[in-house]
Amino acid sequence: MRRWVLAIAILAAAVCFFLGAQAQEVRQGHQTERISGSAGDVLEDDPVGRLKVYVYDLPSKYNKKLLKKDPRCLNHMFAAEIFMHRFLLSSAVRTFNPEEADWFYTPVYTTCDLTPSGLPLPFKSPRMMRSAIELIATNWPYWNRSEGADHFFVTPHDFGACFHYQEEKAIGRGILPLLQRATLVQTFGQKNHVCLKDGSITIPPYAPPQKMQAHLIPPDTPRSIFVYFRGLFYDTSNDPEGGYYARGARASVWENFKNNPLFDISTDHPPTYYEDMQRSVFCLCPLGWAPWSPRLVEAVVFGCIPVIIADDIVLPFADAIPWEEIGVFVAEEDVPKLDSILTSIPTDVILRKQRLLANPSMKQAMLFPQPAQAGDAFHQILNGLARKLPHGENVFLKPGERALNWTAGPVGDLKPW
């Protein structure tokens, strides 16, 4: 057994040395690979001139006042809802004439209610969202003519507009009934799931671009780490028996590979975390309580091949980013075979994935920079909205027609906010 482990370790070291040298050539020579098919063109689309967005002017209690009370919201992985609002206020797609708008946006910061430790509390979010919708339905005519079908909302919670961080309870709640006709822009994405409805736009979580930029290392640094991961394997406070968190996938990673020399995995989060990702060939991106996490963004930005362990996940901007070509997908049940899966990937396949990841448009699409830049996540969201135009005949209701049930949902959600 020891000889086998030693042989694997030697093989891994040789692979890492070779890949590191090749990656160094890629970075020094700025070698990238054109994204195949139409995806590259889609990433580089300019949404300006293809749609107009009207931004509702809501009282500050729905947005800016919440942020003023707790500025930590700007650095949270759910901060896309704040930065999207800021972006649209000065965007060329914004119109001040609602009669010419293709889309209507309601700026509600539903995740900006944090615990002392910085975790979001979603319990007030449904009442807050409902209050905002009641306001726009009362003061403007545009909601009522479509009951939200030409409106979009940014809902970056763990399980989107189901507004709960535990999947079982999120499923029990379902999507807020008043949002059933709206387009949801959300980080959560999983096929055939109650909390992802048809037509939603799946986006990356927020990861601070400036912070990542500050941790860039020289481009000629070899990738000497084969597999890298930092994070929880067990969530003992919320899942003391250990069978529910990450559907056991993270626990399986730890139990199978904690002593494997190929795997640099730990619960410790070192100050060199970003640098270590840039020294790694593969970065594990397993599900946690939800399928997604900022690791996916970080892996792409730092050119570390994302190893996605989350069955049926719907990835950000999947119609534009060729995830199958840049990442590795491992079924949750196959985690015990992770070492053999990764070591069996041909070197030329790994190098091609690295060249694709080196494409600047790939990295840009995953970020919400300040100020906004061409091709970034803001523009990918607008591109997604533009591709839904023109609206179909079923968007606008006939006089007197109603599609939504304003009294549906949990009783607690009907209380005033």
Curated annotation (Swiss-Prot):
Pfam families listed in its UniProt record: Exostosin_GT47
Gene Ontology molecular function terms on file: glycosyltransferase activity
Keyword presence, Mitochondrion: no
This enzyme's EC code(s): 2.4.-.-
Lumenal side: 25-417
GO aspect biological process, one term: protein glycosylation
Enzyme class: transferase
Compartments where located: Golgi apparatus membrane
Main location (coarse class): Golgi
Source organism superkingdom: Eukaryota
Alphabetic keyword roster: Cell wall biogenesis/degradation, Glycoprotein, Glycosyltransferase, Golgi apparatus, Membrane, Signal-anchor, Transferase, Transmembrane, Transmembrane helix
Cytoplasmic side: 1-3
Glycosylated sites: N144, N405
Alphabetized InterPro entries for the sequence: Exostosin, Exostosin_GT47
Single GO cellular component term: Golgi membrane
Its membrane topology: Single-pass type II membrane protein
Family classification: Belongs to the glycosyltransferase 47 family.
Entry function: Involved in the synthesis of glucuronoxylan hemicellulose in secondary cell walls.
PANTHER family linked to this entry: BETA-1,4-XYLOSYLTRANSFERASE IRX10L-RELATED, EXOSTOSIN HEPARAN SULFATE GLYCOSYLTRANSFERASE -RELATED
Protein name in UniProt: Probable glucuronosyltransferase Os01g0926700
